[in-house]
Amino acid sequence: MLSLESEVLTRHLPLFANKSILLFGDVRDRFADQIKANAKSVAVFSSYFDYARQYADVSFGLYCEIKAELAVFYWTKNKQECQYQLLQWLSQVDVGQEMLIIGENRAGVRSVEKLLEPYGNIAKIDSARRCGLYHFELQSVPDFDGKKFWKSYRLQDLNIFALPAVFSSAELDGGTQLLLSTFNKADRLKGKVLDLGCGAGVIGASLKQQFEKIKLTMSDIHAMALESSRRTFAENALDGTVVASDVFSNIEERFDLIVSNPPFHDGIDTAYRAVEDLIAQAKQRLNRGGELRIVANAFLPYPDLLDKAFGSHQVIAKSNKFKVYSAKA
């Protein structure tokens, strides 16, 4: 099934004929298969591991270094993330480079005109399916300074670092704050700990600082989150393993504690698939007596999922907005 963005692109198939093509940005479907027959070659790059892991021909990472005669960028909901990815890629190509930018109007794709105008000619060439399609030709190669995109803030004795689109990138969010408040030195936490959906590494860094002897693994699907966690740990001289994983897809070991402030937003829609998988599979990923501890908006339907997977659960902290759930294997 094609996304709305790709449906618009199918109206312009002649543009892809006999050219090397790169699809990158928020690619979520198999539009690549639609153009392989007529294009010279098709490459796909994604910063999202949940998508990239499904297909052998999709490259995953933070920096896209793939060149092509025509690039197609799928706009994401986060303007700064788009700016980072577009300027990073354009900084390494030549004047005259052609690019198409496609995105939903509600995701703010219109702002691409102001973003790319200083670097070349940009024009809207189609409007359909509540999306805008733009053609861009590079006239002035931009300088890309990745350092300018970093945000940081202080959390007690920790320095937290985050790239665009990483959750809780500017300050500690209320849910994570409530979750962290349920840990204290008296817990004597030890063994293997997994911070799943680690974002900027806030939870993992806080636990590692309090409980030095834990063996910590942090995972996320977003390349920007993984890089953010790595930097947070490096800047605070903490030890931890950072892995790209779609829930447990790339994690084989068992843990004594799995802790998470799980995402329930996918792009600009709400999605529960990752959280459902986390709760359903967590018991099999815990050692005997191990614990799953998660925080969530109070209105989300997690109690039933926890009871189905574990038999029972406890609410160990709550605020007006959030609840912290604990379930034991």
UniProtKB/Swiss-Prot annotation:
Reactions catalysed according to its record: guanosine(1207) in 16S rRNA + S-adenosyl-L-methionine = N(2)-methylguanosine(1207) in 16S rRNA + S-adenosyl-L-homocysteine + H(+)
Highest taxon in the source lineage: Bacteria
Family matches, as Pfam families: MTS, MTS_N
Keywords assigned by UniProt, alphabetized: Cytoplasm, Methyltransferase, rRNA processing, S-adenosyl-L-methionine, Transferase
MF term (GO), any: 16S rRNA (guanine(1207)-N(2))-methyltransferase activity
Subcellular localization, as worded in the UniProt entry: Cytoplasm
GO CC term (a single one): cytoplasm
Keyword S-adenosyl-L-methionine carried by entry: yes
CDD domains (alphabetical): AdoMet_MTases
Predominant location: cytoplasm
EC numbers for this chain: 2.1.1.172
Statement: the UniProt record of this protein carries the keyword Repeat: no
Stored SUPFAM superfamilies: S-adenosyl-L-methionine-dependent methyltransferases (SSF53335)
InterPro entries the record matches: DNA_methylase_N6_adenine_CS, Mtase_sm_N, rRNA_ssu_MeTfrase_C, RsmC/RlmG, SAM-dependent_MTases_sf, Small_mtfrase_dom
Family: Belongs to the methyltransferase superfamily. RsmC family.
PANTHER family attached to this UniProt entry: RIBOSOMAL RNA SMALL SUBUNIT METHYLTRANSFERASE C (PTHR47816:SF4)
NCBIfam families named among the record's database cross-references: PRK09489.1 (NF007023)
Free-text function comment from the UniProt entry: Specifically methylates the guanine in position 1207 of 16S rRNA in the 30S particle.
Subunit structure: Monomer.
Protein name per UniProt: Ribosomal RNA small subunit methyltransferase C
Gene that this sequence comes from: rsmC
